[in-house]
Each structure stands twice: as C-alpha cells, then as structure tokens.
Amino acid sequence: MLVVISPAKRLDWAERDVPVTQPDFQEDAVRLSKTARNLTLGSLKSLMGLSDDLARLNRDRFNAFAEDPAPEATRPAALAFAGDTYQGLEATSLDENERAWAQDHLRILSGLYGVLRPLDAIQPYRLEMGSRLKTRRGSNLYEYWRDDLSKALNAQAQSVGTDVLINCASQEYFGAVAPKALKLRVITPAFMEDKNDGKGPKIVSFFAKKARGAMARFVIQNRLSDPDALTGFDTGGYAYQPELSTPDKPVFIRPYPAS
C-alpha cells in the first residue's frame, strides 16, 4: 500500500542525524519560490492569510530559498513537519528499518514540493496547497500540480507493487490529485469522536489529523499490504465500525474526550 499525508504549517528545525534524499520536484520548488518572492509583503500576507510577522518570516524564507541548498539549511521532511498529523506519525521514534520502509510507502503532498518522501531534504517554507498563487500553469497550485501528483503517485505505487492508496491527507491537499488520472483504489479512513450526548459521533479536526498520522504509522510499523488489515487500527482508543463503513471508507470511533 501507498499512504499519503498532508504537510504542516509548523516546523521543528532541530538537527537530525539522518541521511536525506533530494525531492523529485526540487526544480519546481525553486520555480515556485521565485514566483512567491516576487510578491509584495501585502500580497503575500493576503495570499496566505498571514499576520505581519508571519508574512515577513515567509518572505525571508522565499528570499533565502536556494536551488542547491547547503545540508545545514535543510531537514528531512517527515522529521521537520510538526503539526497534528505528525504528532500521530511520530516519525522521530521510527527505527531505521521502519523509516526505510516508509521512504517507499509514504508520501507527503506539498504546495511547494509537490510530493515528498519522508527523508527528502526540505528548506523551511510555508505554502498551502489552497493558495491562489498564479503561475505559468494556472491561477492556483491545484492547476500547477494536478497532473504531476497523479503521475508521481501512480509511478510510486507501481514501483512497490500496489494498486491501493490510503488517503490520510486533508481534502485541501488530496484535492490537488486528479482523480481520473489516478490509477489506484483510494481508501480514505474517517476518524470520529463520540461525546455520548445523543448527537452521534462527530469529526473533530485536531483529533482527526492526529489519527491520520497514527494510521500512517500503523501501516508503516506493520508493513501492511492488505487493505482489510486497516480494520485492526486501535491507536488512541479508536475502534473500527463495520456498520458505518464501506470498503473504501473505513470508519473508526472512540469516546470523547480521549483518555
């Protein structure tokens, strides 16, 4: 199976003694960074919905973005992203063999880099996939990346001998993948919390994001190849709900708040 997750806005730039690889779409990342650095501070602030301080920080990041960055200026992607999904993934605690397996079976969708392997070297950035950054390919990043993402995922799935993709990414990011061009069965797990208030279980964004990362970790640590094995996921107290699930949308529920 191939698993996809979203990146994160927050970064952990601690040094890591881990070998890194070069992103497949490094040239595109450079091209997009040059486009972004040409924006005024006000335009960048509006484009990404940033405060003044964050707009200045990300303008500086785009200005410093290098075509061939020094090793000390980069970090491995899965260890650098620090959002909710990555709390669930806990990439820093994966052992060497698990990271090697993840390198082939986990992909991170990115507004700047397109598709990243866990150990791909990234420079600090923030550029959400939903950003309406105008490029030579269109008026937003969906139009820029759509064909490339589908081709890259198809090729990687073929290289590891699978026709199944586990979508643990957000709608914002997976929406950049052209569905008709994706030659894979897509399974999208749903994670819900039951407050026992008579209103039924609900998706709570923070918990759902963390659970997606935990599901990716579950696949990695168990080296899953059979989609039916996803039903065994029970991290954090979640339990598979067969009566609410379909083959391509397994549903997992746990009591709220999480213990």
UniProtKB/Swiss-Prot annotation:
Domain of life: Bacteria
A GO term from the CC aspect: cytosol
Database matches in InterPro entries: YaaA
GO biological process: response to hydroperoxide
Pfam families with a match to the protein in the record: H2O2_YaaD
Family per record: Belongs to the UPF0246 family.
Protein name per Swiss-Prot or TrEMBL: UPF0246 protein RD1_0358
